[in-house]
A protein has these predicted regions:
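Outer-membrane beta-barrel pore domains
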Residues: 49, 56-60, 79, 85, ...
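Outer membrane beta-barrel
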Residues: 30-187, 192-199, 203-212, 276-289, ...
Length: 354
């Protein structure tokens, strides 16, 4: 009996592990399905330029504090590939009963469809950025100091216009293309007639995978427009640019052919070039600023040229979602025309972006 009992105990002891090993493993817990974003996703930001300007030559010592830009950027992702932007801006009225007042106006209001072709491509419809100025301002961060060269000389009527455009990167990082059709009057004016402006920019990055040479780009821009029938409004720009954490340089040349006057329809040829350089500690920290513009407003007229020199520097604070710049410059404008008084001004400015 004792033997039978011991044998039974041994059989039970051996059977328990075997039984445990043959138990099926519990089913793995299913991974939760990622939650879909709840559209629309709305982000609100601000871009503002504040300044103090003091005239020091031929302007009777005029000086003033001012707000030269105040954007409220409202960006909405309506669906996975659908976006909308609305940006009101503040401008100073210079005529009428409200002359001198700051008033609100619409700067941008457009819809955008993403990834129409190559990844990173998009199409826009409405009041949005034209191909050149927004691109140049992405390289030269000193829009707070003043307008870019072509806009300052009146060849591009503002950075935004009513129209439709398409943007696409080139394969393997070799550049990008942006082109569209616009009213041609800029965002401050309504369409004057049936004629439109066709604008296109091609930017080539010849060495996308070559270290420091990655920062080199060559860009070309062309605007084919009309004031009216037989009154062209053409502009061509070629620019080389180099971007590095410690140095940004651009050199551009432009030519324009225009017939602005309806009463005296004479074709005017204009040309000029501009150099911009910013040696800096990096995106954050101290930076120097040098810009030289030379522009001839009418090649057929003597003494129609003017030169602008901007020199100074700034200090930049850059965070993941915000940027503050403190900028001080001296701007001198020299006119070849003897009857045109030269200009010189000191500018103290602040750039706020968040």
């Amino acid at each position: 009996m004792t033997r039978s009992f011991v044998l039974s105990v041994l059989l039970i002891a051996l059977a328990v592990p075997v039984s445990a090993q043959t138990q099926p493993n519990p089913p793995a817990s299913a991974q939760p399905t990622p939650a879909q974003p709840e559209y629309p996703i709305i982000r609100v930001g601000v871009l503002s330029y504040l300044q103090y300007a003091a005239e020091t030559e031929n302007r009777d010592g005029a000086n003033s504090f001012d707000v030269t830009r105040a954007y409220l950027n409202i960006n909405a992702q309506v669906a996975r590939r659908v976006r909308f932007r609305f940006t009101p801006d503040i401008r100073r009225i210079t005529d009428g009963s409200l002359a001198g007042s700051l008033t609100l106006r619409v700067k941008y209001a457009f819809g955008q469809l993403d990834t129409l072709g190559h990844p990173g491509s998009w199409a826009r419809f409405g009041l949005h950025q034209t191909p050149w100025l927004d691109f140049e301002e992405s390289i030269n961060r000193y829009r707070v100091q003043g307008q870019m060269f072509a806009e300052r000389e009146g060849l591009i009527p503002g950075s935004g216009d009513f129209g439709a455009s398409y943007f696409t990167p080139l394969p393997d990082g070799y550049g990008e293309v942006h082109g569209g059709v616009f009213n041609g009057e800029g965002f401050t004016q309504q369409e004057a007639n049936k004629y439109k402006s066709v604008q296109a920019r091609l930017t080539v990055r010849p060495f996308p995978n070559r270290g420091i040479a990655h920062g080199l780009r060559v860009s070309g821009f062309f605007n084919k427009g009309w004031y009216a029938a037989d009154r062209p409004r053409d502009l061509g720009i070629v620019m080389g640019s180099f971007e590095h954490p410690n140095l940004v340089v651009t050199l551009q040349h432009l030519n324009a052919t225009e017939t602005p006057s309806a009463t005296a329809p004479v074709e005017i040829d204009r040309n000029g070039w501009s150099l911009f350089a910013e040696p800096r500690q990096g995106p954050s920290g101290w930076a120097g600023l040098l810009r030289y513009d030379s522009f001839e407003s009418d090649e057929a007229l003597p003494d129609s040229a003017r030169q602008r020199v901007i020199a100074g520097g700034g200090y930049w604070f850059v965070w993941p979602r915000a940027k503050v710049g403190l900028v001080a410059t001296n701007e001198h404008v020299d006119y070849d025309q003897p009857t045109q008084l030269d200009e010189n001004r000191v500018l103290l400015q602040m750039h706020f972006e968040f």
